[in-house]
């Protein structure tokens, strides 16, 4: 569990500890907003993401896996009776409980990819990737805001092929005047799209087809996860899925 992942700094142990830490923070957000606010201030003053892995480094692999799985079970139990539209605090603006839990799914999938890459494992994608893809599409404004860039006007049509072979689409596929396809679009497999928006693969190492300047710029900075701008992956760093 101490083997290094290909992304900077963290081991597989650190990945699991990070997921455990923020599953617990999500539980606080859903059940005790005041405690969440206190903890958020502590986390910001003590290293942020790096503080999230410190406890895990002091545990054995078995202990860490146990507390992570127990914590995830507690989170699922707390979420079962929630109004999906209820607002809950997070780091930055509040969000709906549904969005909070979808973000946890996205984070687990993304860090799970780091673990798979470190171990040389291949995961089989499922249609649950739609949740990750949806966050990636809706996070387009955030991808600009986190870099203090102004998002250009205009929509980008996203058309993805699901793992089961279905079609997933976001935003108007026309160019707005009824004369043809959207000027800016991203098409390809849902897996490739999710790998790019979570910054687990460089765009050049996928089969996504990116058309138009708005789409090209977005895909160069796409970021589905919260926090400062991610470092992403270098071209050629990964070629497998």
Where are these regions (language model features)?
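Residue-level detector of secondary-structure transition/capping positions
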Residues: 23-24, 201
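Alpha-helical scaffold segments that form or flank carboxylate-/histidine-based iron centers
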Residues: 2-22, 52-64, 89-107, 128-132
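Broad hydrophobic/π-residue packing in well-ordered secondary structure
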Residues: 10, 18, 26, 66-70, ...
């Amino acid at each position: 569990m101490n083997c290094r992942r290909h992304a900077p700094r963290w081991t597989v142990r650190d990945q699991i500890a990070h997921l455990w830490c923020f599953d617990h923070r999500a539980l606080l957000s859903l059940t005790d907003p005041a405690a969440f606010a206190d903890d958020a201030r502590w986390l910001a003053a003590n290293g942020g993401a790096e503080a999230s892995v410190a406890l895990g480094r002091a545990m054995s692999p078995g202990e860490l896996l146990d507390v992570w799985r127990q914590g995830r079970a507690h989170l699922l139990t707390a979420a079962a009776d929630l109004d999906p539209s209820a607002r809950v605090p997070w780091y930055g603006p509040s969000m709906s409980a549904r969005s909070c839990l979808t973000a946890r799914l996205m984070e687990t999938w993304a860090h799970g990819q780091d673990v798979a890459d470190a171990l040389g494992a291949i995961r089989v994608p499922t249609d649950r990737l739609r949740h990750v893809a949806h966050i990636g599409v809706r996070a387009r404004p955030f991808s600009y805001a986190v870099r203090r860039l102004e998002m250009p006007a205009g929509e980008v049509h996203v058309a993805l092929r699901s793992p089961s072979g279905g079609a997933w689409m976001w935003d108007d596929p026309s160019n707005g005047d009824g004369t043809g396809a959207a000027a800016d679009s991203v098409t390809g497999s849902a897996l490739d799209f999710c790998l790019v928006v979570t910054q687990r693969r460089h765009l050049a190492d996928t089969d996504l087809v990116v058309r138009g300047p708005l789409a090209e710029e977005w895909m160069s900075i796409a970021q589905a996860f919260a926090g400062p701008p991610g470092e992403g992956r270098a071209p050629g760093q990964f070629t497998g899925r």
